[in-house]
């Protein structure tokens, strides 16, 4: 009986034969094969992974955007010394690797999209990573023509990371407000946000205002003085 690792290696050989240089293997994680595909080959490779009898990845389980802006860098700068840091997930690069970057992230590339595929036919999973073409905006072809389930997943990656998916039938925000400024999962997005939103009863509508808090380091809780603490709001709550 083959072990799981033997079965994975056998299937890895099948993928190498079938796709050649279009798929580049990277270190596996959690017993799941992981490959990189260049942006120009993404659509054709995904279509073949779905249709090839030895692959039959009929289902896109999930896709997610990734921002590698700070990946592999040292601990965050703080105002005070810390003996243990924040247990930040970072990899130690091997000898000869560029300083400050982990081995699995490439210098000069910032945004990527990761696809998790499932073959119901063969009971297999595989993970793909495609680096976006360009940085601002990051671009990739939409895979909605291959897997319809990619529709809302790609909208989420666009909303949170700003990835533009060419050929998507309805690429618009899905989680944030329509007037939201920026993409909140980017590593350079301010933790305090860009604006504050509240309902103004006098105007009868939602209003946008400058952020009233300041970013601070090593402060787990910030007590804000905003509209909820205004005297009229407190009186209304007390007598409501």
Tell me the role of every PLM-derived stretch.
Residues 1-240:
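Terminal low-complexity/charged segments
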């Amino acid at each position: 009986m083959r072990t799981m690792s033997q079965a994975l290696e056998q299937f890895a050989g099948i993928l190498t034969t079938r796709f050649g240089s279009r798929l580049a293997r990277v270190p596996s994680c959690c017993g799941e094969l992981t490959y990189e595909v260049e942006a120009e080959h993404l659509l054709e490779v995904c279509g073949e992974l779905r249709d090839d009898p030895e692959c039959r990845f009929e289902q896109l389980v999930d896709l997610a955007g990734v921002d590698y802006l700070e990946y592999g860098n040292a601990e965050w700068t703080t105002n005070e010394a810390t003996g243990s840091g924040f247990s930040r997930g970072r990899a130690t690069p091997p000898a000869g690797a560029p300083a400050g970057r982990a081995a699995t992230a490439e210098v000069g590339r910032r945004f990527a999209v990761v696809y998790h595929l499932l073959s119901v036919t063969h009971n297999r999973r595989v993970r793909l990573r495609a680096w976006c073409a360009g940085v601002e905006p990051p671009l990739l072809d939409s895979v909605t023509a291959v897997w319809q389930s990619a529709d809302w997943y790609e909208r989420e990656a666009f909303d949170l990371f700003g990835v533009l998916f060419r050929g998507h039938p309805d690429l618009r925000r899905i989680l944030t407000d329509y007037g939201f400024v920026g993409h909140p999962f980017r590593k350079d997005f301010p933790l305090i946000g860009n604006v504050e939103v509240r309902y103004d009863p006098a105007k009868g509508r939602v209003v946008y205002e400058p952020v009233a808090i300041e970013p601070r380091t090593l402060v787990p809780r910030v007590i804000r003085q905003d509209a909820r603490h205004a005297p009229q709001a407190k009186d209304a709550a007390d007598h409501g």
